[in-house]
A protein has these predicted regions:
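Conserved functional hotspots at enzyme active or ligand-binding sites that engage polyanionic ligands
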Residues: 1-114
């Protein structure tokens, strides 16, 4: 089971338009949530497209490290449930606490939580 904040790589990319595909997702679900199924709640990570630049639900993240790090955004409002078999078994990365706090702020606003 993947832990909250883990970056997962899709076994096959998910297409969302011409030339656009989603390869990486971040786990939003707590690892302490009862695992009654092989489903995990994730949000897509994508290139920071100009059309989405002002979208409140985007949280910046860098995939990779050092000079090879690629600036990306987590599109939190597009959260979804997916079975774990849709992802590679190895974790591709991990979000830092500051990124997770930003995700939490978006989730609270999106779901009208206090």
């Amino acid at each position: 089971m993947a832990d909250r904040g883990d970056v997962l790589t899709a076994r096959r990319t998910f297409g969302f338009g011409r030339g656009d595909s989603l390869e990486h997702f971040i786990v939003l679900q707590s690892a302490s949530f009862p695992g009654i199924s092989d489903t995990v709640v994730v949000a897509p990570i994508r290139k920071p497209l100009p059309a989405l630049a002002a979208w409140v639900g985007n949280v910046p993240i860098a995939l990779g490290s050092g000079a090879t790090a690629k600036p990306m955004v987590i599109v939190v409002p597009l959260l979804a449930a997916a079975t774990t078999d849709r992802f590679e078994p190895e974790v591709a990365g991990r979000a830092d606490p500051r990124t997770m706090a930003a995700i939490d702020r978006v989730l609270r606003a999106l779901l009208a939580l206090r």
